[in-house]
Structures are given as C-alpha cells and as structure tokens.
C-alpha cells in the first residue's frame, strides 16, 4: 500500500512538472482527460483486487489530485494532468464516491 501511494505521488508531481516544462494548454487538457479516464478503472481494479472497500480512499485520491494541481499552479503552470490522475484514481478507489 505504501509503495502504491509513493507511485501515485510521484505521478502527480511528474504530471504537474510536465505543465511547468511547457507542454501547453491543449496537451495538458488532453492529459487531464486521458489520466482521469484511465484512473477510474485502474483505481477500481486496485480497490477490488486488494479488498480496499472503504469510500474514504476516494477522498485521498482527490486530495492528492488537488495537491498536484496546486503544485502546478504554484510553479506558474497548470497541473491538470496531476489533478486528473488523482481524481480518477480517487473515484476508482472510492467506487465512484468522493468521500
């Protein structure tokens, strides 16, 4: 579980940094959509395979996503990719529930 959280945080930082490095509006909105779309089924698969059934995990993913989003903005960029990944994984892990 700890390694999964570490990988998620690394992904959030990486996608936020991608915004900082100047991938542009279109690419970041695309990353948001793609990561959000991939995050939901991946989160659900992890939740079911590891017997994580508590909706609260959705909140963790959403908060992680906001962290990536805020980090991107703080650097003068747009971390929509990190937001999408955290939100999608959060919804998946929470079985569609945010809290």
From Swiss-Prot:
Domain of life: Eukaryota
Compartments where located: Secreted
Disulfide bonds, paired cysteine numbers: none
Organs and tissues of expression: Expressed by the venom gland.
Predominant localisation class: secreted
One Gene Ontology term, aspect cellular component: extracellular region
Record's signal peptide: 1-18
Protein name stated in the entry: Glycine-rich protein
Family: Belongs to the non-disulfide-bridged peptide (NDBP) superfamily.
Keywords assigned by UniProt, alphabetized: Secreted, Signal
């Amino acid at each position: 579980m700890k390694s999964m959280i570490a990988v998620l945080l690394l992904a959030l930082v990486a996608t936020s940094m991608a915004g900082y490095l100047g991938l542009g509006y279109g690419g970041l909105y695309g990353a948001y959509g793609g990561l959000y779309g991939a995050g939901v089924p991946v989160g659900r698969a992890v939740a079911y395979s590891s017997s994580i059934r508590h909706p609260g995990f959705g909140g963790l993913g959403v908060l992680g996503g906001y962290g990536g989003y805020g980090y991107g903005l703080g650097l003068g960029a747009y971390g929509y990719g990190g937001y999408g990944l955290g939100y999608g994984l959060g919804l998946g892990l929470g079985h569609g529930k945010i809290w």
